């Protein structure tokens, strides 16, 4: 009798994706983050669903409904903090996942990579509208400042911002539509993630060497299922340490003050995972220039396949490129730090230098280093 998992129309899809999938025998723990992102997404959808059962998207009651969830709903506090800190874990996994793709040249899978970039944008949009929902001070002012950036678009900017707001300022209409967006976007992310996986399985996974591994494949189950479960346990351990011991570590104290349009917080800043882009935005004195730099800081990822000048796919055997890659990581950490600092000397200068460094590394230095390495191979 033929195994049902190989013949049943639905189970066949699951089997080909998670059980009998031929996987390279040498993929390291950096390949765990795709499955961890899947776990994060499921966790966020589930906790978000339970939060939505008690949340009200009205400016008068939004803040108190979140307080009600934490105080009066059974285990509401843990659901709320798992959702808030789950977003941070999501972005940590995302950044590592993208970094892995850059390091090992996974961007040569064009469709998979471009859908991944769209996914990154969608997750960032979801996190942004989600941050507005508790209707604290930073929620309100973050929404005002970031949506206002669109007014820099020539000719249609002001109309576009007022259309997004649903009025002449961030108000009830804005909060209601942001809640609607925050509810629907995770399902769009799920569909995109499935497409991402579909295109990945057309080519098969990359591996640390960047060399085709067709002659050396092993079944995904049990080898990588066990490996993924270990990663999942570590992820949940770190998440629960955050939730149970320091739930507000990554949040902003200003968000425990109800939104007040008449009082501006001293330092308006987004959540930590947007700080690198926020620092790039602030480092340019011109509004439109800043908005373009902000968009380009992520869009530059779509250029990676075009900027790949090396004869080797992976950075595993390219010490010069490795060095520049880790400088890029340090630069992003610097930008993240600067984004959380007030706009004053010396932070302005550091931010501008780090922003120049960011684009120089990706657009000029790394392709140049790859060409130097190509020439070294001829020696």
UniProtKB/Swiss-Prot annotation:
<comment type="function">
    <text>Component of the ubiquinol-cytochrome c reductase complex (complex III or cytochrome b-c1 complex) that is part of the mitochondrial respiratory chain. The b-c1 complex mediates electron transfer from ubiquinol to cytochrome c. Contributes to the generation of a proton gradient across the mitochondrial membrane that is then used for ATP synthesis.</text>
</comment>
<feature type="transmembrane region" description="Helical">
    <location>
        <begin position="226"/>
        <end position="246"/>
    </location>
</feature>
<dbReference type="Pfam" id="PF00032">
    <property type="entry name" value="Cytochrom_B_C"/>
</dbReference>
<keyword id="KW-0249">Electron transport</keyword>
<dbReference type="InterPro" id="IPR036150">
    <property type="entry name" value="Cyt_b/b6_C_sf"/>
</dbReference>
<keyword id="KW-0408">Iron</keyword>
<dbReference type="GO" id="GO:0008121">
    <property type="term" value="F:ubiquinol-cytochrome-c reductase activity"/>
</dbReference>
<feature type="transmembrane region" description="Helical">
    <location>
        <begin position="33"/>
        <end position="53"/>
    </location>
</feature>
<keyword id="KW-0349">Heme</keyword>
<dbReference type="InterPro" id="IPR005798">
    <property type="entry name" value="Cyt_b/b6_C"/>
</dbReference>
<dbReference type="InterPro" id="IPR048259">
    <property type="entry name" value="Cytochrome_b_N_euk/bac"/>
</dbReference>
<keyword id="KW-0679">Respiratory chain</keyword>
<feature type="transmembrane region" description="Helical">
    <location>
        <begin position="77"/>
        <end position="98"/>
    </location>
</feature>
<dbReference type="InterPro" id="IPR027387">
    <property type="entry name" value="Cytb/b6-like_sf"/>
</dbReference>
<comment type="similarity">
    <text>Belongs to the cytochrome b family.</text>
</comment>
<keyword id="KW-1133">Transmembrane helix</keyword>
<comment type="subunit">
    <text>The cytochrome bc1 complex contains 11 subunits: 3 respiratory subunits (MT-CYB, CYC1 and UQCRFS1), 2 core proteins (UQCRC1 and UQCRC2) and 6 low-molecular weight proteins (UQCRH/QCR6, UQCRB/QCR7, UQCRQ/QCR8, UQCR10/QCR9, UQCR11/QCR10 and a cleavage product of UQCRFS1). This cytochrome bc1 complex then forms a dimer.</text>
</comment>
<dbReference type="GO" id="GO:0046872">
    <property type="term" value="F:metal ion binding"/>
</dbReference>
<keyword id="KW-0496">Mitochondrion</keyword>
<feature type="transmembrane region" description="Helical">
    <location>
        <begin position="347"/>
        <end position="367"/>
    </location>
</feature>
<feature type="transmembrane region" description="Helical">
    <location>
        <begin position="113"/>
        <end position="133"/>
    </location>
</feature>
<feature type="transmembrane region" description="Helical">
    <location>
        <begin position="288"/>
        <end position="308"/>
    </location>
</feature>
<feature type="transmembrane region" description="Helical">
    <location>
        <begin position="178"/>
        <end position="198"/>
    </location>
</feature>
<protein>
    <recommendedName>
        <fullName>Cytochrome b</fullName>
    </recommendedName>
</protein>
<dbReference type="Pfam" id="PF00033">
    <property type="entry name" value="Cytochrome_B"/>
</dbReference>
<dbReference type="GO" id="GO:0045275">
    <property type="term" value="C:respiratory chain complex III"/>
</dbReference>
<dbReference type="GO" id="GO:0006122">
    <property type="term" value="P:mitochondrial electron transport, ubiquinol to cytochrome c"/>
</dbReference>
<keyword id="KW-0479">Metal-binding</keyword>
<keyword id="KW-0830">Ubiquinone</keyword>
<dbReference type="GO" id="GO:0005743">
    <property type="term" value="C:mitochondrial inner membrane"/>
</dbReference>
<feature type="binding site" description="axial binding residue">
    <location>
        <position position="97"/>
    </location>
    <ligand>
        <name>heme b b566</name>
    </ligand>
</feature>
<feature type="binding site">
    <location>
        <position position="201"/>
    </location>
    <ligand>
        <name>a ubiquinone</name>
    </ligand>
</feature>
<feature type="transmembrane region" description="Helical">
    <location>
        <begin position="320"/>
        <end position="340"/>
    </location>
</feature>
<feature type="binding site" description="axial binding residue">
    <location>
        <position position="196"/>
    </location>
    <ligand>
        <name>heme b b566</name>
    </ligand>
</feature>
<dbReference type="InterPro" id="IPR016174">
    <property type="entry name" value="Di-haem_cyt_TM"/>
</dbReference>
<dbReference type="InterPro" id="IPR030689">
    <property type="entry name" value="Cytochrome_b"/>
</dbReference>
<keyword id="KW-0812">Transmembrane</keyword>
<keyword id="KW-0472">Membrane</keyword>
<keyword id="KW-0999">Mitochondrion inner membrane</keyword>
<feature type="binding site" description="axial binding residue">
    <location>
        <position position="83"/>
    </location>
    <ligand>
        <name>heme b b562</name>
    </ligand>
</feature>
<dbReference type="InterPro" id="IPR048260">
    <property type="entry name" value="Cytochrome_b_C_euk/bac"/>
</dbReference>
<keyword id="KW-0813">Transport</keyword>
């Amino acid at each position: 009798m033929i195994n049902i998992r190989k013949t049943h129309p639905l189970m066949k899809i699951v089997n080909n994706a998670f059980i009998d999938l031929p996987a390279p025998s040498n993929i390291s723990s950096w390949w765990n983050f795709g499955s961890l992102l899947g776990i994060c997404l499921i966790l966020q959808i589930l906790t978000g669903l339970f939060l939505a059962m008690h949340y009200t998207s009205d400016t008068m009651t939004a803040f108190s409904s979140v307080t009600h969830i934490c105080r009066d709903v059974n285990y509401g506090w843990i659901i709320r903090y798992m959702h808030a800190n789950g977003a941070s874990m999501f972005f940590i996994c995302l950044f590592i996942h993208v970094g892995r793709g850059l390091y090992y040249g996974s961007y040569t899978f064009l469709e998979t990579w471009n859908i991944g970039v769209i996914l990154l944008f969608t997750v960032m949009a979801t996190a942004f509208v989600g941050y507005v929902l508790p209707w604290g001070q930073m929620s309100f002012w973050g929404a005002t400042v970031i949506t206002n950036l669109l007014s820099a678009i020539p000719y249609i900017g002001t109309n576009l911002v007022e259309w997004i707001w649903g009025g002449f300022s961030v108000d009830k209409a804005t909060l209601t539509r942001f809640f609607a967006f925050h509810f629907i976007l995770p399902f769009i992310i799920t569909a995109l993630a499935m497409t991402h996986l579909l295109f990945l399985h057309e080519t098969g996974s990359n591996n640390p060497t960047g060399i085709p591994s067709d002659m050396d494949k092993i079944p995904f189950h049990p080898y990588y299922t066990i490996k993924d479960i270990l990663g999942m346990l570590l992820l949940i351990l770190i998440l629960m340490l955050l939730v149970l011991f320091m739930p507000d570590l990554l949040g902003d104290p200003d968000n425990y003050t109800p939104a007040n349009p008449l009082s501006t917080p001293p330092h308006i800043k987004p959540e930590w995972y947007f700080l690198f882009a926020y620092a790039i935005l602030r480092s340019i004195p011109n509004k439109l220039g800043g908005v373009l730099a902000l968009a380009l800081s992520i869009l530059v990822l779509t250029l990676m396949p075009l900027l790949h000048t090396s004869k080797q796919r992976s950075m595993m055997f390219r010490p010069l490129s490795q060095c520049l890659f880790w400088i890029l990581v340090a630069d992003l950490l610097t930008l993240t730090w600067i984004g959380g600092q007030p706009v004053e000397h010396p932070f302005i200068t550091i931010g501008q230098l780090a922003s120049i460094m960011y684009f120089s590394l990706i657009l000029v230095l790394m392709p140049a280093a790859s060409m130097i390495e190509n020439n070294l191979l001829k020696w």
